Amino acid sequence: MVSIRPDEISAILKQQIEDYDKSVSVSNVGSVLQVGDGIARVYGLQQAMAGELLEFEDGTEGIALNLEDDNVGAVLMGEGLGIQEGSTVKATGKIASVPVGDAMLGRVINSLGRPIDGKGDIAASETRLIESMAPGIIQRKSVHEPMQTGITAIDAMIPVGRGQRELIIGDRQTGKTAIAIDTILNQADQDMICVYVAIGQKAASVANVVEVLRERGALGYTVIVAASASEPAALQYLAPYTGASIAEYFMYKGKATLVIYDDLSKQAAAYRQMSLLLRRPPGREAYPGDVFYCHSRLLERAAKLSDAMGKGSMTALPIIETQAGDVSAYIPTNVISITDGQIFLSSDLFNSGLRPAINVGISVSRVGGAAQTKAIKKIAGTLKLELAQFDELAAFSQFASDLDAATQQQLSRGKRLRELLKQPQFSPLILAEQVAIVYAGVKGLIDAVPVDQVVNFSRELREYLKSNKPEFINEIQEKKVLSPEAESVLKAAISEVVSTMVASAN
C-alpha cells in the first residue's frame, strides 16, 4: 500500500501556487448597438483613443472616429456583413499603420498596405503610422531643385520644384491623370521614387494605369495605392495618408519622392459621407467643418528637407476635378489655397485639339521659378506672357475686320507657339529637347513654317539633334545651361530643319 506523506503534497501545492502566473490580459471590449452604411455605433470602449483600430467579431476592422458620452462611432474598413447587433468589439490599442520599405516598389496595395496585385505578401522592413506630423519649419529648406515633368508647357512656364505642392485641376476628361502619368514616366533616370494614389476610381482605370507603367518600365520605382469606387468610404478616405506615409519613409532616407493624389475631390466626398453618417454637423456644400484640415495636414507633409535631415524631398501633385470649370467651389478653393500653384486644364482647349489642354493664363507656380534650370529659364521668360496675350488677341480678332501688321504677326507667332507645345500622351521630352523647341518658337525662327507643319517640325528637329548634334544634347543635359556655343549650334540646326521643310513644301 502506498503511503501518503502530507508534507510532500503540501510542498508540491506550494510550488504550484508560487509558479502560478497571475498576470491577467485586460482588453477594452464593447458591444455593437447599431451597424449599417459602413458605420457602427459601439457601447463600451471607455478607454478608446481617437483613430484607434477596432476589431469586430467577424474579423472586420474599423476606426473609432466619434468618441461620445455613451457610445463610440466607428467607420468600417470592410463590408461588415457578418457584424450583428450585440456582437463584441475589441479595441486593439493601435493606430492605423502601413508597411513601408523597398519591398513596396512595383506593388499595388490597398489603403491598409495589403497587396491586391496577386503577387503574394510584401516582406516590408518596417511600418509607419498612416497619420504623422509634417516636418517643422527648421527641418525644411526652400524649394531649389527642378522636378522635370517632361511636359514642355509645364517645365517652361509652370515649373515644379522638388518639395513643391502643385495642384492639377480641371473638369473630367481633360487629361489630368495623363499629366500625372507622364510625370512618373519622366522620372525613369531621375532617381526618384513615385507613389500613385488612386481614390474612388474605376478598377479598370487603375488597371490601365498599372499596365501603362509596366509596359514603359516605370513600375520598378513606383508604388500604387488603390482605393477604387467599390471600396468602403473609410478606405477611400485613408488612401492619400497611406501614400504619404510610404513616400515619407523614402524622404527621410534622403530620397526624392513624388506623390500623386488622384483625386482629392473623391476623398473629400468619402469623408463627407462618413461625417454625415456619424451625424457630425455639416457645413458648406454639406462638407464637415474640418475638411480643410483634412487636406492641409496631408499636403503639408510634402517638403524639401534641410541638409541636416538628409536632403530628401516629397513633391505632391494633388488632382481636383471641377464641375463645369467652377474653381470657386468649396474643395477647389481650399486646395488652391493650400498648394504652391495650380495647373488648370480647360475642356474648351482640350476639345479644340490642344493636348495637354493647359490654360496658361490662370495656371501658376508660386515657388517653382526658383527651381527652374537656367537653360530653359533664360529662353522661356517671355513665353507665358506671349501666349496669354495671344489668347486675348485671338478672342478680340474674332470681332475685328482688319488688323494691323504687328497684331497679325503676334497672332501668327502665338499660333505657332501653341502648336509647338502640343505633345502626345506618354512621350515626355528631355530638357535639351524642350530647350530646342521653346528656343525655336520664342526667337521667331519658325515663322516661315506653315502652322499645320509645326508639330512635324518639332519632331524633325528632335530627331535631327539626336542623330547629327548629340554633343548639344549631352551639354544641355549635363550642364543645364545654354552656352553661346550651344546656342549657335542650335540656331544652325533649326535653320537647317526649317529650310528642308520649306523646300519640301514648295
UniProtKB/Swiss-Prot annotation:
One of its GO terms (molecular function) is ADP binding. Gene3D superfamilies: 2.40.30.20, ATP synthase alpha/beta chain, C-terminal domain, P-loop containing nucleotide triphosphate hydrolases. Produces ATP from ADP in the presence of a proton gradient across the membrane. The alpha chain is a regulatory subunit. It is a peripheral membrane protein. It is an enzyme of class 7 (translocase). It comes from Synechococcus sp. (strain CC9902). Its EC number is 7.1.2.2. It is found in: Cellular thylakoid membrane. CDD domains: ATP-synt_F1_alpha_C, ATP-synt_F1_alpha_N, F1-ATPase_alpha_CD. PROSITE patterns: ATPASE_ALPHA_BETA (PS00152). The record marks 363 as: Required for activity. Keywords: ATP synthesis, ATP-binding, CF(1), Hydrogen ion transport, Ion transport, Membrane, Nucleotide-binding, Thylakoid, Translocase, Transport. NCBIfam families: atpA, PRK13343.1. ATP binds at residues 170-177. GO terms for cellular component: plasma membrane-derived thylakoid membrane; proton-transporting ATP synthase complex. The keyword 4Fe-4S does not apply. It catalyses: ATP + H2O + 4 H(+)(in) = ADP + phosphate + 5 H(+)(out). The keyword Cytoplasm does not apply. This is ATP synthase subunit alpha. It holds the Pfam family ATP-synt_ab. F-type ATPases have 2 components, CF(1) - the catalytic core - and CF(0) - the membrane proton channel. CF(1) has five subunits: alpha(3), beta(3), gamma(1), delta(1), epsilon(1). CF(0) has four main subunits: a(1), b(1), b'(1) and c(9-12). Belongs to the ATPase alpha/beta chains family.
